[in-house]
């Protein structure tokens, strides 16, 4: 009977840990399951070894397990309540799939609903259509000899919070009367390091028409932190280091598969995610802003040398954290970019017009995308975009 109880306790703790690691929910409660499992094992041990010195050790383990089991709930109870919540089939079923080179990518051939809610109010309720190639749907030219305009970046390019017909690539294609072969390579949570690696690996090659190419990258200040793996969801991306000429060079993966598994597992605990992971992810030897500038130089280099393309960087200068540091790094490195405030002069004065739900959701609105699309369309058609 005792052996059966031991086996049951061991099975319980193994099931708990595996369940937390590999299932999407419950999140942030890893230590609860570990603590309860340890307590069950320790309780069995205390009865098994009662009257011996091992009994005291089991009692200590029991108390330790009970303490562990309350750490995550305590942290969650003291955390600020989420201002917004994501709902719909996009968040529940689709969102990302693994990618051995870039860390993660979009699923292929799916249509998902994305809802964002705050305080009982629906911020947006939209549909995302992902084509068979893993790109956000964009109506484009069917002429095999036309020029290419490739939009690359993160959620700003992808069009989070917007329907398919409101994204920047789609509005640009509409403004140019489907004159160009337009592809939306945007993936939410990407950084410039993933854009650069995709270009180096020739990811756009199968989708290029025979004409010349333009690569439009939408930049935000947070891409600097993403390039140095400052977030748990970015641990499997490509790593870069600055070369002697200030151009970023590929340096393998940000973390090994084993390290990525450990970090992903630890992130399932609210306590460990708050108090342990920041120290593990921090890389004091890397200057995120200089690296970001080096990545921008590398992106332009690959665009020009590999694709003979004009590289266009749109920089969202919307007064957020790290923006001054990124601008200073760009200026010091001689990185050319187009500030979005140049395209939209009242960007800071009219945040409600150009951001979905400021200050909690700063993604561009369709109105902002229309102005940017019109700017790009005019400059490309009159040949002044590279000037």
Model-derived features: where do they sit?
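Conserved SGNH/GDSL esterase-like catalytic core that processes O-acyl groups on lipids
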Residues: 158-243
């Amino acid at each position: 009977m005792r052996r059966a109880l031991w086996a049951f306790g061991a099975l319980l703790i193994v099931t708990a840990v595996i369940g937390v690691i590999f299932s999407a929910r419950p999140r942030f409660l890893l230590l609860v399951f570990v603590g309860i499992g340890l307590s069950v094992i320790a309780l069995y041990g205390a009865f098994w070894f009662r009257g011996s010195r091992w009994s005291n050790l089991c009692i200590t383990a029991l108390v330790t397990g009970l303490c562990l089991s309350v750490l995550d709930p305590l942290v969650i109870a003291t955390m600020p309540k989420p201002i917004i919540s994501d709902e719909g089939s996009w968040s529940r079923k689709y969102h990302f799939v693994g990618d051995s080179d870039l860390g993660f990518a979009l699923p292929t051939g799916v249509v998902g609903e994305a809802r964002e809610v705050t305080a009982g109010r629906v911020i947006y309720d939209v549909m995302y259509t992902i084509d068979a190639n893993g790109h956000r749907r964009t109506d484009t030219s069917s002429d095999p000899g036309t020029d290419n305009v490739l939009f690359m970046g993160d959620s700003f390019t992808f069009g989070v919070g917007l329907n398919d017909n409101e994204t920047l690539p789609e509005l640009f294609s509409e403004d140019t009367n489907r004159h160009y072969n337009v592809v939306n390579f945007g993936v939410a949570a990407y950084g410039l390091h993933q854009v650069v690696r995709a270009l180096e690996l020739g990811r756009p090659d199968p989708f290029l028409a025979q004409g010349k190419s333009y690569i439009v990258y939408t930049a935000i200040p947070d891409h600097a932190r993403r390039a140095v793996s400052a977030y748990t969801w970015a641990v499997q991306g490509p790593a870069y280091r600055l070369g002697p000429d200030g151009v970023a060079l590929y340096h393998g993966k940000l973390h090994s598969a084993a390290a990525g598994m450990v970090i992903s597992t630890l992130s399932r605990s609210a306590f460990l995610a708050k108090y342990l992971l920041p120290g593990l992810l921090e890389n004091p030897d890397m200057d995120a802003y200089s690296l970001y500038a080096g990545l921008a130089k590398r992106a332009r280099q690959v665009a020009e040398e590999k694709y003979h393309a004009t590289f266009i960087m749109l920089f969202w200068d919307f007064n957020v954290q790290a923006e001054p540091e990124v601008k200073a790094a760009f200026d010091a490195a001689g990185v050319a970019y187009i500030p979005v405030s140049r395209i939209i002069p009242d960007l800071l004065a009219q945040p409600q017009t150009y951001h979905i739900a400021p200050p909690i959701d700063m993604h561009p609105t369709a109105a902002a995308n229309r102005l940017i699309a019109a700017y790009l369309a005019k400059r490309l058609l009159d040949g002044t975009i590279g000037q």
